[in-house]
Amino acid sequence: MASSGPKLISETAESGNARDQLIEAASQIMRDGDTIDLSLSELSMRAGLNSALVKYYFGNKNGLMLALLDRDMGNIVHGLGALVAKDMPPEEKLRLHIGAVIDTYYTYPYLNRLLLRMVRDSAPTEAARIADLYLRPISKAYDNLISDGVKAGKFRNIDP
């Protein structure tokens, strides 16, 4: 008899470890529920793992949220940096980036809310780490992209 509920991460993961299964389960819960709040019992059920593993791998639920943010934002920063470094017209880079942003928010609709919560609710050192790893590199990439477009005569220079 087939189950009609969501698949357990442990049933769908090919070779993932428990840490990755917990991160993916948290991501699925946030996508399915359109929320950034989750309970450890729901996480445990979805991952098919003991909720004590959250403390083992992440220290607490906040640590899990930071690991999820690191996974998702790390990919974004890496991809944006690679795009800016490509040898192509700035307007094409912008077009590709906008498409990637749409794809990202379709795949991870919780990401912006999670990022804002982690910056707002984390200790100052953790908030600074998030800014240094993700927000500053994204801002720098945008500055470079716009500057390249202005130099190429494709974008107008404006005073924000």
Where are these regions (language model features)?
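Conserved hydrophobic residue
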Residues: 35-36, 151, 155
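N-terminal intrinsically disordered/low-complexity leader segments
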Residues: 1-17, 28
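Helix-turn-helix
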Residues: 21, 29-63, 67
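Hydrophobic alpha-helical connector segments
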Residues: 67, 81-111
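Amphipathic alpha-helical packing segments from all-alpha helical-bundle domains
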Residues: 74-82, 107, 125-151
